[in-house]
């Protein structure tokens, strides 16, 4: 699940055979039986074609900023799997070949970082940078990244002019009046209309099951009999959907920081639950800042840190910092701390420096760079994909009374993120395209053990999601980092977690029972 700025506020999301093989089961309840059968046949046809065509690997285009020895290529997929011979779109993929011997190589490891709307094209760089946490896996696997449909170089979608999207300051996401709410509702409806105007042809085909089908076509194009997959955040839901649709096509699957896959959680309830988890982790960070008051001088109790935050918000609302940083931009910056432990010290330092008179560091961190054209296009695209996927995946409440009631209630106890998250997702209430019924994620015949990794205090994907997927994927193993909260645990600093991920990827073996790891060390100021 992703973090970004949207509309009038800042918000979060929430990081096979050469021939496709047996026909995948259609998504239960996601389509009519007839349409689901057509999509199942369509993905088989597309995978057959991709297996025959392969991927023409070559140096990456210069403007992609991906240097050799990483290679890039394209995989063609149907826009609509019910019409496999209709319009095709091209998906960008890249790879770094395994560093081991021919005997050590086990295939390709395909990665999705989450979002929805995140690009996986940076994944192969983990080999180039010689990250020691990935050395063993790099000997066994080609590291493969891709831009999912609608993202980056893969038929990118857009909902609003990028310069308009990033302009600041935006309205305070916490409404002071009914007029404030009406203004935000208007922005949300206009944003949804903009998606239809700029990207209408793509919108009905931006679902997670569509991307899972793309993943199976990529598998076939890679020449892989079965898929090895690493998914983080939203990538865990993509993996869960893939595992349900194509259980016999999975070889190894690691899912890290898990979206709750229950049908009634996708996606409205997921975002409400996220508001609660963000407040919990925000409180953890405030306590840490208070414990380290000698370094930061923000407040020596969590209550004083909270008061300092409210004072900062109020001042920025009255007079935006540098003319561009108001409450929305502050939330967009400060939410890094609940997301990632690695952001705790840098975020506190910038805040401390601001209180000491250095405003520029906070402006640089929180305000958009209007001169960064490429970055702003990417940010707008990522937000458009986030919205399109979540709105298309499920039927959302259309009654403003329900949205207002639920978020007003939540804000009373969990104020840090609630309204920002609500406005970010409100376009789904007036979504101008098809909304499906989520897939019933379950263990299918032939699905191997899946490794699930999760910290208990994750803000973006609450721990209950990992427990739910563990119940649904029989034979899976759950590795829990207790009393920790970083979003995306794999490859960080906990050897208890990393050793089990390595062992699973290299051997397919898991512990006989679920494992609870002690937390990694608390960040130092």
For each feature predicted by the language model, list its residue ranges:
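Secretory targeting and sorting signals
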Residues: 1-31, 75, 215
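An N-terminal domain-start capping segment
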Residues: 13, 18, 26-27, 42-56, ...
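Solvent-exposed, charged interface segments at domain starts and junctions
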Residues: 31, 62-78, 82-83, 87-91, ...
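Gly/Pro-rich cap/lid or specificity-loop segments adjacent to the active site
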Residues: 36-329, 388-525
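Alpha/beta-hydrolase-fold enzymes
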Residues: 288-390
């Amino acid at each position: 699940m992703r973090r970004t700025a949207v509309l009038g506020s800042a918000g979060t999301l929430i990081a096979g055979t050469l021939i496709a093989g047996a026909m995948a089961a259609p998504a239960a309840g996601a389509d009519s039986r007839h349409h689901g059968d057509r999509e199942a046949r369509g993905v088989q046809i597309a995978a057959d074609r991709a297996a025959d065509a392969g991927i023409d690997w070559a140096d990456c285009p210069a403007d992609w900023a991906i240097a050799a020895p990483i290679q890039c290529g394209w995989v063609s997929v149907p826009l609509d799997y019910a019409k496999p011979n209709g319009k095709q779109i091209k998906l960008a993929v890249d790879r770094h070949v395994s560093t081991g011997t021919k005997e050590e190589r086990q295939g390709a490891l395909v990665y999705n970082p989450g979002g929805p709307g995140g690009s996986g094209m940076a994944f192969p760089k983990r080999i180039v940078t010689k990250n020691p946490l990935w050395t063993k896996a790099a000997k066994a696997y080609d590291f493969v990244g891709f831009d999912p449909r609608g993202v980056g170089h893969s038929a990118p979608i857009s909902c609003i002019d990028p310069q308009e999207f990033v302009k600041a300051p935006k309205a305070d996401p916490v409404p002071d009046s009914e007029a404030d709410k009406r203004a935000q509702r208007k922005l949300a409806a206009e944003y949804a209309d903009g998606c239809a105007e700029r990207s209408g042809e793509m919108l009905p085909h931006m679902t997670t099951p569509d991307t899972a089908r793309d993943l199976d076509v990529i598998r076939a194009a890679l020449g892989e009999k079965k898929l090895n997959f690493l998914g983080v955040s939203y990538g865990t839901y993509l993996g869960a959907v893939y595992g349900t649709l194509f259980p016999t096509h999975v070889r190894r699957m690691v899912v890290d920081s898990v979206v709750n896959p229950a049908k009634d959680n996708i996606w409205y309830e997921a975002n409400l639950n996220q508001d609660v988890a963000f407040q919990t982790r925000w409180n953890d960070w405030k306590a840490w800042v208070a414990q380290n008051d000698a370094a930061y001088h923000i407040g020596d109790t969590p209550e004083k840190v909270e008061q300092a935050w409210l004072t900062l918000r109020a001042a920025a609302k009255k007079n935006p910092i540098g003319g561009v940083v108001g409450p929305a931009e502050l939330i967009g910056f400060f939410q890094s701390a609940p997301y990632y432990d690695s952001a705790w010290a840098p975020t506190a330092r910038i805040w401390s420096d601001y209180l000491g008179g250095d405003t520029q560091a906070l402006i640089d961190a929180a305000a958009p760079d209007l001169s960064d054209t490429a970055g702003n296009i990417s940010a707008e695209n990522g937000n458009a994909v986030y919205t399109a996927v979540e709105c298309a995946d499920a039927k959302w409440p259309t009654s403003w009374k329900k949205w207002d009631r639920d978020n007003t209630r939540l804000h009373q106890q969990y104020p840090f993120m609630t309204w920002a998250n609500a406005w970010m997702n409100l376009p789904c209430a007036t979504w101008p395209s098809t909304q499906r019924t989520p897939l019933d994620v379950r263990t299918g015949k032939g699905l191997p053990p899946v490794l699930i990794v999760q910290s208990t205090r994750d803000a973006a994907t609450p721990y209950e999601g990992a427990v739910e997927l563990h119940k649904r994927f029989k034979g899976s193993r759950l590795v829990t980092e207790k009393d920790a909260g970083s979003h995306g645990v794999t490859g960080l600093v906990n050897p208890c977690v990393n050793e089990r991920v390595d062992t699973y990827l290299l051997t397919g073996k898991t512990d006989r029972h679920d494992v609870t790891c002690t937390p990694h060390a608390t960040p130092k100021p």
